[in-house]
Regions:
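Short acidic low-complexity segments
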Residues: 154, 237-246
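Glycosyltransferase specificity loop/lid
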Residues: 6, 12-234, 261, 275-283, ...
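Intrinsic disorder/low-complexity segments
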Residues: 559-562
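Long, low-complexity segments enriched in small/aliphatic residues
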Residues: 246-261
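Structured loop/turn residues at beta-strand edges in well-structured enzyme cores
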Residues: 143, 245-248, 266-269, 346, ...
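C-terminal membrane-proximal segments flanking the terminal transmembrane helix
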Residues: 552, 569-570
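Donor nucleotide-sugar binding/catalytic pocket of nucleotide-sugar-dependent glycosyltransferases
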Residues: 252-256, 269-279
Length: 579
């Protein structure tokens, strides 16, 4: 009989304990699975697209994801997430109406600071409704979440995490790296958000960058965060904490940017780049679109889309675009809603919805005309397509500033651009091979990373869950004051030390000068009187030559030409010399 292998003997020995091992393994699996709540912003559906993609990936890892959404907000049902509804100020229809009203304000030039405050007020009012909803808060606490994901566009997420007493991480769906993250941000080469600057600045640009930075910090500190602090005070949220503390309390910052797009800058261990969540290979086009694209032949086609959030363009801009596009030899497919432009070319196809990623991945595409939305730019970069960008609001300007600086596209200002400038920009990115070469190079850099952005996101979420918030990644910057951070205490010590040294040196100098003057005065007057005692002037004299208690002598030889007295006071005078 052949010998029984050792591992078989081990299995036979463990057979009676198999149920216990199975139970232990199941317990380990359950412990690794987590319950995560996401607080998306009350508008901007593009942000929700990203969170749905992340939720699906988390579901594959065994995690549960819950979206906190207002009643009436439309979202496709899925087994990958579930919904916790609440009565908010917006549903899908009213949210879209509000956003489109702001778009009309932009095109009419009425988007002033008051309009921006109105948007901020809507966010804070919705937060007030959430925090004040006791039934909702009770239901959320009973869920016993392991982690909360905060979109910084919805600052209420910090307040909700504090109320629930749960760990939280920031998942920024926009191109946003605020100073509140805590990472060093030298203004000499780190452009502030909305500054429209690159990492190479001249003197005037650095001045502008500094001014924008100070305005941003003022706005966050005195306009944004206090609104949410008042909400916490109103509803007696305990323990009391400032919004700054809550922002700094994030376990991790996952930012939707990428080394291929962002300018190099200092960062921290708890800040990771996960830009490009929605990027993926192109799928086959629907038959009608495939036939239309194939009909473009060697000229190719141009894709035009301003994103899901921009449904209507002003008539002036739409006509400029239509006229410029009509002059191109390429075919044009344009995602468009509203009234048809009056000068639309025969080469242009209007469509209300299109498979943007699949069109960008088609081999016959020549260029992309976009608003510079971050999701669109990452899809464009992924497929290596040159772009002409017309930013409209938000982070569109910063995104397109980077695209242009990287040599992948051209930025145009919708307020000042002409139809000719738009046409020339499109012709340039289509015919100048450097734009496509640079776009393809950035595509290689973007893809040459450890895993897809979705997988990296899931990895980091698992990481902070495994390590109970990963406090070891947090720098000490979160526990020191601004006074210490900017070394103002050191500057004060040096200033006081320099002042003390100045006064000590000044006092010593004054004393030395005073003593020197006194000694010099004594020497000078002794010489004038011509009196020495044992070769040393005794200092007892008068200007008329009288010496107290001594006989007055005439010393004619003391007077030389010019009348200057010369007294050799190195020895005593003899009577013969005085005679």
């Amino acid at each position: 009989m052949p010998p029984v292998p050792g591992y078989c003997l081990l299995l036979l020995a463990m057979k009676p304990y198999a149920p216990a091992f199975i139970l232990l393994w199941s317990a380990v699996g359950i412990a690794r699975a987590a319950k995560i709540v996401v607080v998306p912003p009350i508008m901007f559906e593009s942000h929700l697209y990203i969170f749905k993609t992340v939720a699906s990936a988390l579901h594959d890892q065994g995690h549960q994801t819950v979206f906190l959404l207002s009643e009436g907000r439309e979202i496709p049902p899925s087994n990958h997430y579930r919904l916790q509804r609440y009565p908010g100020i917006f549903n899908s229809s009213t949210s879209d109406d509000f956003l489109q009203s702001k778009m009309r304000s932009i095109f009419s030039g009425r988007l002033t600071a008051l309009e921006l405050f109105d948007i901020l007020d809507h966010y804070s009012k919705n937060c007030d409704m959430i925090v004040g909803n006791r039934n909702l808060m009770r239901a959320l606490k009973q869920e016993k979440f392991d982690l909360l994901l905060v979109d910084p566009n919805e600052m209420c997420g910090f307040v909700i995490a504090h109320l629930l007493g749960v760990k939280y991480a920031v998942f920024s769906t926009g191109l946003w790296y605020p100073a509140e993250v805590g990472a060093p941000a030298p203004l000499s080469y780190v452009p502030e958000f909305n500054s429209l600057l690159t990492d190479h600045m001249n003197l005037f640009e650095r001045i502008k960058n500094t001014v924008v930075y100070l305005i941003s910090r003022f706005g966050v500190s005195f306009l944004v965060l206090p609104k949410y602090e008042r909400i916490m005070q109103k509803h007696k949220v305990l323990p009391e904490r400032s919004m700054y503390d809550l922002v700094h309390g994030s376990s991790l910052w996952m930012l939707c940017t990428d080394v291929a797009l962002e300018f190099p800058r200092p960062t921290l261990p708890n800040v990771v780049y996960v830009g490009g969540i929605l990027t993926k290979p192109a799928s086959p086009l629907p038959e009608d679109l495939q036939a239309w694209v194939n009909g473009a032949h060697e000229n190719g086609f141009v894709l035009v889309s301003f994103g899901a959030g921009v449904k209507y363009l002003s008539e002036d801009i739409a006509n400029k675009l239509a006229h410029a596009l009509a002059r191109l030899p390429q075919r044009v497919i344009w995602r468009f809603s509203g009234n048809k432009p009056r000068n639309l070319g025969n080469n242009t196809k209007l469509i209300e919805w299109l498979p943007q990623n699949d069109l960008l991945g088609h081999s016959n595409i020549k260029a992309f005309l976009s608003h510079g939305g971050l999701n669109s730019i990452f899809e464009t970069m992924y497929h290596g397509v040159p772009v002409v960008g017309i930013p409209l609001f938000g982070d569109h300007y910063d995104t397109m500033t980077r695209v242009q600086a990287k040599g992948m596209g051209i930025l145009l200002n919708w307020k000042t651009m002409t139809e000719s400038e738009l046409y020339e920009a499109l012709v340039k990115v289509i015919n100048d091979p450097s734009y496509r070469q640079r776009a393809q190079r950035l595509s290689e850099i973007h893809k040459d990373q450890p895993g897809h952005p979705v997988n990296r996101t899931v990895y980091w979420i698992n990481y902070i869950l495994r390590h109970n918030g990963a406090q070891h990644l947090r720098a000490a910057v979160y526990s020191i004051s601004l006074f210490q951070y900017f070394l103002l205490d050191i500057a004060l010590v040096l200033l006081v030390g320099a002042a003390l040294l100045y006064y000590v040196l000044a006092g010593m100098t004054k004393l030395i000068c005073k003593q020197s003057k006194h000694l010099w005065s004594n020497d000078k007057h002794s010489a004038v009187n011509g009196h020495c005692q044992n070769g040393i002037p005794n200092g007892k004299y008068r200007r008329n030559g009288h010496i107290k208690h001594e006989k007055k002598f005439e010393v004619p030889w003391l007077k030389e030409k010019g009348g200057k007295p010369v007294l050799p006071c190195c020895r005593s005078l003899t009577w013969e010399e005085l005679g």
